[in-house]
Structure formats: structure tokens, C-alpha cells
Amino acid sequence: MNKPIIALDFQTYEEVETFLAKFSGETLSVKVGMELFYSNGPVIVEKIKQQNHEIFLDLKLHDIPNTVKSAMIGLAKLGVDMVNVHAAGGKKMMEAAKEGLEIGSPSGKRPKIIAVTQLTSTSETDMQTEQLIKTSLLESVMHYSNLSKQAGLDGVVCSALEAEDIKQQNGADFLRVTPGIRLASDTADDQIRVVTPEKARLIGSSNIVVGRSITRANDPVAAYNQVLKEWNA
């Protein structure tokens, strides 16, 4: 999934269909998150796959290892390209998640699996006062990244601001998938650690996830092409 990943932050397939129709003939990388998946079920993935788009299924699993393993067996059968868990679930949970994907993958080739470190809506103060993690935000992200690597995962979800440090610690092949991407003309909304596609490329992101800058644009195709231009420059 080398192209910018478009976050399909919609509730209905009709909205998705209308949006994707604007990109007729183009193969996209898209993110199906909780809102869309929980509103429509697995059929939403099947319909998008029928259009040959790559899918990052963003459900952020976080439960006991056996439950996550069983859930991943089911998700693997959907044929998506990437899934994720919360690194806070621990090393054993992440190992179980990967094992579940390997068991459930019908073709023998499992989806990529990455772990969420800290949400891009979380500030250092939030983390320290609400999660009672007394390190710096960067130290927390780096710890979770290292734990994910030890568990055999393919990478992490992180802010672009931490991407270069993770690349140095865990290697260039370890994915650094970064949400919180906005075009310079857009607002940050509810995300705290936000950068442009160009800056994300320059400071070490391996993949970017872009939602509102594209889906809420007056001309989504033009906005996507602008993101693509900055990302590939």
C-alpha cells in the first residue's frame, strides 16, 4: 500500500459508492474504520474489494490474546491488505493477533499487521494525566514500537513526528503508518499531532492516511491528486 490511504469516514455504502465513483478506473488504497464497518458489517469490505481497491481495516483490536487471535482468524478471511491492534494490549496479544491472521489467511499470504502506539488525538499531557504514563510521549511511542517489533508485527501507527525515530530504532522496513495528515489549507479538527503530506514524507513516514482533506473537499479528486503530488515529490 504505497499510495496515500484514503480514510473512508462514511456511515453508508451509498456514500462510499458515490465517493469512489469519482475515481473511476483508478485503484486506490482506502481505510475502512469502525464507523463504516460497524454500520455495514463485512459486506462493506467485500463490495470495496470487488472494485480492486486495497483495504486497510482499521478496527484497533484490544482484548485478551485468545479473543484477538480468534477475531483475526475471521478478519483474515475477508481478504483485506492490512489490519491493526492496540500495542497497549501487550506483546502476547500482538503475537496472538499475528498467529490468528496466519491461520485465517485463505491464500497463505496474511495481511500486514500494525499496532497503534498513541492516538494522534492524544497530547503528552493527556497521556500523563489520563493514562498515568509518566514518560514523555515520544518515549511511550518508541516503547510500543519496539514491543510491536519484538512481537513480529510489520509496523506501527504513529504520528509523522515520531516516524524518523522509529525508522532509526526498528529499521526502514518496519512500517510507519501515519494518520493526522492535512493539506496546509485545512484545519486540524480533533487531531493534535498533524502534518502535511510533504512534511510526512520528509520526516520518515512510510505510509500516510488522509481523510477529511480529501473526503470533505469540494473536489475530492483534485485534493487527492494534490496529496499524491506532495507525497511523491
From Swiss-Prot:
One GO process term, biological-process aspect: 'de novo' UMP biosynthetic process
Coiled-coil regions listed: none
Catalytic residues (UniProt): K60
Reported function: Catalyzes the decarboxylation of orotidine 5'-monophosphate (OMP) to uridine 5'-monophosphate (UMP).
Name used for this protein in its record: Orotidine 5'-phosphate decarboxylase
Alphabetized InterPro entries for the sequence: Aldolase_TIM, OMPdecase, OMPdecase_AS, OMPdecase_bac, OMPdeCOase_dom, RibuloseP-bd_barrel
Enzyme class (EC, first level): lyase
Domain of life: Bacteria
Keyword list, A-Z: Decarboxylase, Lyase, Pyrimidine biosynthesis
Family, similarity comment: Belongs to the OMP decarboxylase family. Type 1 subfamily.
Classification via HAMAP family: OMPdecase_type1_B
Catalytic activity from the UniProt record: orotidine 5'-phosphate + H(+) = UMP + CO2
PROSITE patterns in the cross-refs: OMPDECASE
Pathway(s) per entry: Pyrimidine metabolism; UMP biosynthesis via de novo pathway; UMP from orotate: step 2/2
Residues that bind substrate: 9, 31, 58-67, 120, 182, 191, 211-212
Entry's Gene Ontology cellular component terms: cytosol
Assembly notes: Homodimer.
GO MF annotation list: orotidine-5'-phosphate decarboxylase activity
